[in-house]
Amino acid sequence: MSKIIGIDLGTTNSCVSVLEGGEPKVIPNPEGNRTTPSVVAFKNGERQVGEVAKRQSVTNPNTIISIKSKMGTAEKVTVEDKDYTPQEVSAMILQYLKGYAEDYLGEKVTKAVITVPAYFNDAQRQATKDAGKIAGLEVERIINEPTAAALRYGLDKQDQDQKVLVFDLGGGTFDVSILELGDGVFEVLATAGDNKLGGDDFDDAIIEYLVAEFKKENGIDLSKDKMAMQRLKDAAEKAKKDLSGVTSTQISLPFITAGEAGPLHLEISLTRAKFDEITLPLVNRTVGPVRQALSDAGLSTSEIDQVILVGGSTRIPAVQEAVRKETNKEPHRGVNPDEVVAMGAAVQGGVLTGDVKDVVLLDVTPLSLGIETMGGVFTKLIDRNTTIPTSKSQVFSTAADNQPAVDIHVLQGERSMAADNKTLGRFQLADIPPAPRGVPQIEVTFDIDKNGIVSVKAKDLGTNKEQTIVIQSDSGLSEAEIERMVKDAEANRDADAKRKEEADLRNEADQLVFQVDKTITDLGEQITEDEKKSVEDARDELKKALEAGELEGIKAAKEKLEGVLQPLVMKVYEQAAAAAQARQGGEADAGAGKKDDGVVDADFEEVKDDK
């Protein structure tokens, strides 16, 4: 069975891993780094992903960052007069990860396990699955990030019974999950979180502080300057990382803007104490979900055996201190917070292929599911933290006499009124026979699959007529849209490959032109005028083809020049070989004619003993 890769599709960075010899291994990107920035940029129609896209983000306004925060919404990103859905942009990142995983493995990759924040709703999960499909991946499983982290952590601890709290603060989302580990069973007891809290918010707090300080000093509002804001974003992210290791950092941005008197520079010293002060409200927001998860699991902090920190933002000292204070535990430091989620996804891939045995994963739905009933009330059918996959049915009736149809409004959330919860979808069960209100029996069944994706069925028990939908929110993509995006992605992949082929060909042609000039110089007078003219004409022809930029023309001119150059190159080699041979011969002769004064000539006389 082909390999199933594990992908942590992150807000700020992404990571890909694969199971090798029973152990998950992180696959480095082409730059040699173990995580890849979740950044996509466009320049003159050319697409860039990862490190190269991030490096030029300050100067390129057509750069997309933190697209994960838009997953599950109908919001689109417009770049170079073209609209892209969050699914399409995420697919570009996935396609890049898939590409370098294939290079590493030396085989085609078609299957993946992709992680999502535990608190992702149905629309966000479906969007992630669609992104995988657009990228040419069969998404075998969507699993929650904290669960994946626990899977990696507990892989070699299956003989120990433990209750583990996973605290996952990434670039854009925050989750807390509590799991029970024992005998190869990884059971999620409860999960809680905040999909609008992450490292980006800590960056924004620093940016707000810098903008306010600069305005106070210079009277200029940098927030109106897009280029300055991008530079501030990069500086804030760097300062945040620096303050995890030092107590003070200098933020220096020369020529940040211009005033009446000329260029202005931003020079501000940011201490860890100040950083802690401006980000305190964000740190405090992590406490509620921790308490909620413990309460839902029916556990006290003393019953937690281990606390695992996941996500780059857990390196912030104030966050670590908040975790210690809330759990009365020193967090476990045996896992890399940037890589553990992808590695856990690879372990799940191994479970699916049968390479990892005796591991059972029991995850939960993070939010309650139900429908709107009379009076705008939210009636729950499946409570949050129910183990999935699961199915639940309940019988409802009509609200009016002779009602011909019922509208089923499917919702996800914890509030008591329907309007305060997240709409997942609506559908109608029609052709209900005329009857007084309360008489028809309408059975509504909710199904949640192993990926946490919801389908709903409504059935008239009197007529056995039923209507089923797989929930698709306003932001969801139809099969036709996904198919179109798959074709676009493949076309882009082909275009990228063609661009690479063209770049490689140009480089080879440039190198060949250089080699011609060097060969002529090396041969000196040994090259005839006819040979010289022939090779120079072919070289000039290749130069013209390079200027014209037509691929087939470059290929033909390159092949012609190679044909003319080959005999001359052989002449250079023969000349070098002859010179080397001559040198060796000279050294041998010199050695033969040299007298060795250490040799003594002597006559020997045989002496016989008389006996």
Swiss-Prot record:
It holds the Pfam family HSP70. Coiled coil: none annotated. Residues 577-611 are annotated as: Disordered. Belongs to the heat shock protein 70 family. This is Chaperone protein DnaK. InterPro entries: ATPase_NBD (IPR043129), Chaperone_DnaK (IPR012725), Heat_shock_70_CS (IPR018181), HSP70_C_sf (IPR029048), HSP70_peptide-bd_sf (IPR029047), Hsp_70_fam (IPR013126). Residues 577-591 have a biased composition (Low complexity). The modification Phosphothreonine is found at residue 173. PANTHER family: HEAT SHOCK PROTEIN 70KDA. It comes from Lysinibacillus sphaericus (Bacillus sphaericus). Residues 599-611 have a biased composition (Acidic residues).
